[in-house]
Amino acid sequence: GHASQVLVRKRRANSMLEETKKGNLERECIEELCNKEEAREVFENDPETDYFYPKYLGCLGSFRAKLFTATRRSANGYPDLRSCVNAIPDQCNPLPCSEEGYLNCKDGQATFTCICKPGWQGEKCEIDINECKDPTNINGGCSQICDNTAGSYHCSCKSGFVMLANEKDCKDMDECSVKPSVCGTAVCKNTPGDFECECSEGYRYNPTAKSCEDIDECSENMCAQLCVNYPGGYSCYCDGKKGFKLAQDKKSCEAVPVCLPLDLDKNYQLLYLAEQFVGAVLYLKFHLPEITRFSAEFDFRTYDSEGVILYAESLDHSTWFLIALRQGKIEIQFKNDYAAQITTGGQVINDGLWNMVSVEELEHSVSIKIAQEPVMNINKPGSLFKPTNGFLETKVYFAGLPRKVENALIRPINPRLDGCMRGWNLMKQGASGVKEIIQQKQKKHCLVTVEKGSYYPGSGIAQFHIDYNNLSYVEDWQVNVTLNIRPSTGTGVMLTLVSGNTLPFALSLVQSTSETSQDILVSVENRVIYQLESISLCSGQQSQLEFSVSRNHLELSTPLVKDVIYSEDLQRHLAVLDEAMKGTVTTYLGGLPEVPFNATPVNAFYNGCMEVNINGVQLDLDEAISKHNDIRAHSCPSVWNDKTNS
């Protein structure tokens, strides 16, 4: 191309030749007129001659023809012919090179050469060289950013970096050191070119306040059922009272599984006597001829040692007759116009077997037979109930007393009776339609088979007031508990002490990580202070757990393990319990009363058999201040036996 020819053209030998040529031009073409041949002799080459001669004729036209005027002069800018002609061979006038990029201009034979400044290229030095794209010097030698500029370039750094003295390399700026308060109360962590304000897990950085703020995970619906947010975290809970427990993911809820199925088969011909915690199961009213004497026959089954079987009274309440159980034996109490009497006797019948009992009023006595064998004969003056208007009218209550009759008895009795009755015949009137009444009511039906014990169905609790103060040391208290348990589910609260809305002590079961075993948890408020792991409690056998706790001592034992627990933490937790024991605590068996769901680690009801001894006293659920109706005080369903496999 043309440009390369320009670059390789031979340079004139030296400035001496230039001077010679200038003198020849003056002589030949300015002082004299020259034709093209004479001009060729001056330049000694064709390109320059061809370039010069037309322009020479132009100068002659301007000046020799006396046409020089102010206008003309201003047009070509030459004052006289000499100036006009001398300027023609100078290819660098007017300047053909880019002013920004050229260093100087070299006149040549009918051409010119632009010498470029560093950073420029092109025939006229009009093209900027992009040093940032130079393959031999990648990125212009800059470590981060190369900025190309007209005729040059410079290096710069990304945000968060500073330029080193060599003006090419960048170094990370440690914002955490430069601006110590940049993150406020959060922790500043320097990163390449930047910094981060870090918060602990469960907190989020607020750039406006420059502080860490607690994330309310509960507002993000993290939990399936119940959620409690606390600074830096959250906990999920499930409604144990509805039979749910927390799943392995600690967020979802799952049904508390049954680990030991029970035989809950019922029969409507068996009347369950403990359906109500207070009051009778049902009552009958008789309106019979006046010659009728009192009689009652029935089959009876119980493990309970005390309670009311039947209570009969006149309509005006003045006369009454009681058939009860005391210490496992039949007791008769009655009061009429003639006498008030009490008799207990016969053999013990609270053996869980069916016993046929008959009570019959004879002319001068009341005869009591068990299995048709006479066991008692009670003398009585006159008839038990006095007829009115030619009729004998009585009310007979099953398994309970009406109103506040307890106070009127000759000897007080706990009326509650966990037992079953079948084949009853009162006043010789047969079943008196009772079967039809109870047939529709599941709750009045008895389990076909039961064992000795107490049963918690996983739906309620029993409440006791127990004084734990040690009588010999007034300042001291002691809780010694023995539990005989046969759980049917692996999760539930067995025993808890409640003070207001808090639970200063609880003993619970939770399903272990293994399907077949359970853990025992001891907790103070909502903290587990001890966990006894992996015991197989759902085997169908009774297991005995013992624990004793005082203000500075906790001991737990099972048939396989005896543990005396001691730790600094334990002392702190026992101090919480000690404080509660100075006030009033209520004892609950089988679950929790209405307290906040997060008051304790486990809130499911206990499901299964359990007998409890506290400080040497066997607790009788009939003596509870209150008890859920479905808790059985003296009977427990048998383990379900798949009849098809046996």
From Swiss-Prot:
Cited InterPro entries: Coagulation_fac-like_Gla_dom (IPR017857), ConA-like_dom_sf (IPR013320), EGF-like_Ca-bd_dom (IPR001881), EGF-like_dom (IPR000742), EGF-type_Asp/Asn_hydroxyl_site (IPR000152), EGF_Ca-bd_CS (IPR018097), GAS-SHBG-PROS (IPR051145), GLA-like_dom_SF (IPR035972)
Subcellular location: Secreted
Sample GO molecular function, one term: calcium ion binding
Main location: secreted
Keywords noted in UniProt: Blood coagulation, Calcium, Cleavage on pair of basic residues, Disulfide bond, EGF-like domain, Fibrinolysis, Gamma-carboxyglutamic acid, Glycoprotein, Hemostasis, Hydroxylation, Repeat, Secreted, Zymogen
Role, per record: Anticoagulant plasma protein; it is a cofactor to activated protein C in the degradation of coagulation factors Va and VIIIa. It helps to prevent coagulation and stimulating fibrinolysis.
PANTHER family in the record: LAMININ G-LIKE DOMAIN-CONTAINING PROTEIN, VITAMIN K-DEPENDENT PROTEIN S
UniProt entry tagged with the keyword rRNA processing: no
Positions of the propeptide segment: 1-12
Domain named Gla: residues: 13-58
Post-translational modification: The iron and 2-oxoglutarate dependent 3-hydroxylation of aspartate and asparagine is (R) stereospecific within EGF domains.
Protein name (record): Vitamin K-dependent protein S
Gene3D superfamilies, sorted: 2.60.120.200, Coagulation Factor IX (4.10.740.10), Laminin (2.10.25.10)
GO biological process terms held by the UniProt record: blood coagulation; fibrinolysis
